Regions:
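Short, solvent-exposed coil/turn segments at beta-strand boundaries
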Residues: 58-67, 168-177, 197
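Sec-dependent N-terminal signal peptides
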Residues: 6-11
Length: 197
C-alpha cells in the first residue's frame, strides 16, 4: 500500500503539469492564429505616383479603422491634388495565412462612409453647377458624404454602409502589401504594394 500512494501522487502530478503545458500551448497557438493586432499596421501608405489625372492609391490605418483613398493629381509628380474618393471601414483582424510565401493577416472590414473631396476651384464650380451626386454646395478641400449615392456625373456608384468586405495585409519595414477590400472573400494574392510615410 505504501508503494502505491507515491505512485498515485506521481501520476496525478504528471497529468496536472501535462494539462497546464497543453493549455499554454493552445493559448499560444490561438494567439498566433488570431493574426497581428490592427495597431501594428497603423500608418499612411502611399502607392506609386500614377501621373497626372490618373488614380493614385493611399491607405490610412488607425487602430480599428482603415481608409482607402483614390487620389487624382493634376501634375505628373503627384504634388497638386485635383480630387479624391475615400472609402472608410471599421476593421478587425481574424486570422493568419500564408500568401505569396508571406505570413499575412486576414482583415474583415465593414463599410462606414464614402467621401468625395474636391481640391480645385474650377472643379468645385463645375460640381455645383452640375449638382454632382445631387449636391450643389461643394466646397474646396471639404469632404462630402456620398455614401450609397449614384453619381452619373462622375461615373461612380458609392456603396452603402454596413457592407462586409475582406482584405489581407502584410507589413515588412516600410513596405505594406494588400489585396484591396472586396466583398467576394479573402484574396489568394498580394496585389498591391505601398510605402509607409
Amino acid at each position: 500500500m505504501k508503494i502505491y500512494i507515491p505512485l498515485v501522487i506521481l501520476i496525478i502530478g504528471t497529468l496536472f503539469f501535462t494539462s497546464c503545458s497543453s493549455d499554454e500551448e493552445s493559448a499560444t497557438t490561438a494567439a498566433a492564429a488570431a493574426g497581428a493586432a490592427i495597431s501594428t499596421f497603423n500608418g499612411t501608405f502611399n502607392g506609386t505616383c500614377a501621373g497626372a489625372n490618373e488614380k493614385t492609391d493611399i491607405v490610412v490605418i488607425s487602430d480599428t479603422t482603415a481608409a482607402e483613398t483614390t487620389m487624382v493629381y493634376s501634375d505628373s509628380e503627384c504634388t497638386t491634388k485635383s480630387h479624391a474618393n475615400t472609402l472608410n471601414y471599421t476593421v478587425v483582424s481574424t486570422t493568419t495565412a500564408t500568401v505569396d510565401a508571406k505570413s499575412v493577416t486576414k482583415i474583415e472590414g465593414t463599410t462606414t462612409t464614402s467621401l468625395s473631396t474636391i481640391y480645385t476651384d474650377s472643379r468645385v464650380t463645375n460640381a455645383n453647377e452640375g449638382s454632382w451626386c445631387g449636391i450643389s454646395d461643394w466646397v474646396k478641400n471639404t469632404a462630402k458624404d456620398v455614401t450609397g449615392l449614384t453619381c452619373s456625373n462622375l461615373n461612380e456608384t458609392y456603396g452603402s454602409a454596413g457592407v462586409k468586405k475582406y482584405d489581407i495585409w502584410y507589413l515588412s519595414g516600410s513596405t505594406f502589401m494588400h489585396s484591396g477590400f472586396n466583398s467576394d472573400g479573402y484574396s489568394t494574392s498580394l496585389d498591391y504594394s505601398k510605402t509607409k510615410e
